[in-house]
Amino acid sequence: YEKGFLQNIEYSIKYDMLHNFNNKLDVISLDGRISTGFKGNSEISITHDYDFVSYYLDKKYSNYASTRIGLNTSPIELLSFGSDISFGKDVAFNDENPELGKEFNFRATLSLQLNNNFSISNLFSFSRLKKVEINEFYYRGFINRLNTKYQFSKSLGIRLATEYNDFSESIFLQPLFEWTPNPFTIFYIGGNQILNKDDKYFVDRSQMFVKFQYLISL
């Protein structure tokens, strides 16, 4: 396939029977995966995970599955994109009385290398787990994170990370200055600012940090 649009096809099947530290059965599952590579440094994959049985907090869950479809591509050096969707059933681990729910997850990443010095990347992820019998959710929300980086030189650069978390209704900001004159010396100075929503207002929590590391070889 090397000269055509279709580059390669790979598949795998995995069977697991896992036990916990007390040597009790924890999970029996069967996973199947197929991936296809295309011209332009692109890949599409499909993964199916079937759990015959699993245990959580001494509770048994039987015969449930989930499917994940993924796409990754980097057709040119300055652009890369990745995305995956998963759906099926999963355990509501965060609930006081964990039951199986209907899950749906979506994730997308986009990275741009605008020039040798400046790059931008964005990550968006959405997750929800819906109760099977009624129209209610164990959880539902999204997180969006934007990272920017500018390199003045190989050793000197600045970064800025911004994130909005819909689950906690919070905003996270992190500016960072970094200096690495050689592989043995690292210097960071930056800060974290978290804005948490409290009723109608955002509560500000700020933190500054400095890190210096020098490796001495003996």
Where do the PLM segments sit?
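Exposed, low-structure sequence patches enriched in small/polar residues
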Residues: Y1-L218
